[in-house]
Amino acid sequence: MYSVLLNPSNTEIYSFLTDRIYRELIVIFATCKVNYKGRAESVASESPRLIILKPDGTVIIHESVKREPLNWQPPGTKIEIMNDYPLKIVAQRNRPKEVIEIDLKEVFYITSAEVKEGDFTIKGREIDIVNTIIQNPSMIEEGFVPLTREYNTPYGKIDLIGLDKKGNFVIIEVKRSKAQLNAISQLYRYYLHMREIKGDKIRGILVAPDLTIHARELLQKLGLEFIRYDIKNYSS
C-alpha cells in the first residue's frame, strides 16, 4: 500500500524510484538544486525541498512558503532517473520544449503509495440548493409546490418557480453566499416580469445563507421575502 525509505543511499534511491515511477505517487524530501530550461531559464540553489512525482507524469517541487510550487511539469511529462553523482531526476516535455533537472544532494526520506481516484462531489452550489428545495419544499413553507426551474426571462433565468398554498406564484432566487444588493435587484426584475405575465398574485423570495444590511433594507422596501438557508441542515 505504501513504502518509506529513511536516509537512503544513492543505490537505494535509484532502485526505489525506478521500480515505482509511473506506478505510485512518490514524495521526496531532499536537499536539491533545480535547473529549468524552456521558455526561460532558472536555477534554484541547494535547499531542502519537497518533490512530488505522480503516476501520470506530473512533477511538482515545493519550498516552505506559498501555495504555488517552485517548479512543475504537467501530466504526460517524461521522467528519467539518472544514476549519476549526485543522483538526478530529469523531467522533460516536448510541447513546449521544457526540461527540469533536479540534483539530489541529500535525501532525507522517500515515500511511495498507491493512490486511487475516488468520487468527488461539490456541495453548496446554487444548483444543489435548488435541488434541495425541490426535494424539501417545506423549507420554503408548508404547502409550497415547485413547478419550474431555470425559467427563461429577458433578464436571465429564474432559479425556481412554484405555487404556495393560496395559489400565488412564488419566484425564488438562490444565492450560495451572503446576498448583496444586486441579488435583490435581480429578484425584483424577475418579480416585475412575472407580474406582467401572471398578474398580481406573485411573491418573490430570496434564499441565501445571509444578506447584507443594505440588501435587507431594499428587500423589505420592495416587498420581497428572505429565507435563510444553511447547507449543514440539509447535508446527508
Curated annotation (Swiss-Prot):
Pfam families xrefs: NucS_C (PF01939), NucS_N (PF21003)
GO cellular component: cytoplasm
Matches recorded under InterPro entries: Endonuclease_NucS, NucS_C, NucS_N, NucS_N_sf, tRNA_endonuc-like_dom_sf
Enzyme class of the recorded protein, top EC level: hydrolase
One function term, GO molecular function aspect: DNA binding
Organism: Saccharolobus solfataricus (strain ATCC 35092 / DSM 1617 / JCM 11322 / P2) (Sulfolobus solfataricus)
EC numbers: 3.1.-.-
NCBIfam families, sorted: PRK04247.1 (NF003270)
Entry annotated with the keyword Protease: no
PANTHER family assigned: ENDONUCLEASE NUCS
Known role: Cleaves both 3' and 5' ssDNA extremities of branched DNA structures.
Protein name: Endonuclease NucS
Compartments where found: Cytoplasm
Family to which the UniProt record says this protein belongs: Belongs to the NucS endonuclease family.
Keywords of this entry: Cytoplasm, DNA-binding, Endonuclease, Hydrolase, Nuclease
